[in-house]
Amino acid sequence: MANDISGNPWIIDTVNGAPLPFLSRVFVKHMEYAGYAVQGNTCIVTDRNGRQIWLATGAFDLEEVRSGDFGVAVNGLNCTQLDGGGILRVYIK
């Protein structure tokens, strides 16, 4: 599968080092990390300047990890690490 940012939520399943095509301000409601393989798998999301805006670590029960309500705009968005075959869902306002 490939990244799909055509709807809401955005579905990110591939990290290729290139930023997502939204380098301007993005209004994020919340994010979810799901479908990872083992406890301790990691998902890291940064802004366009490389500042970490969310770090998710896989839980022992393999349930999805939720960010809680962001409710703010971030300057660009990039998923720099996505372990264990997981997916990142980004809900946009």
Regions found by a protein language model. Give the residues of each.
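C-terminal interaction-tip segments
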Residues: 1-26, 83-93
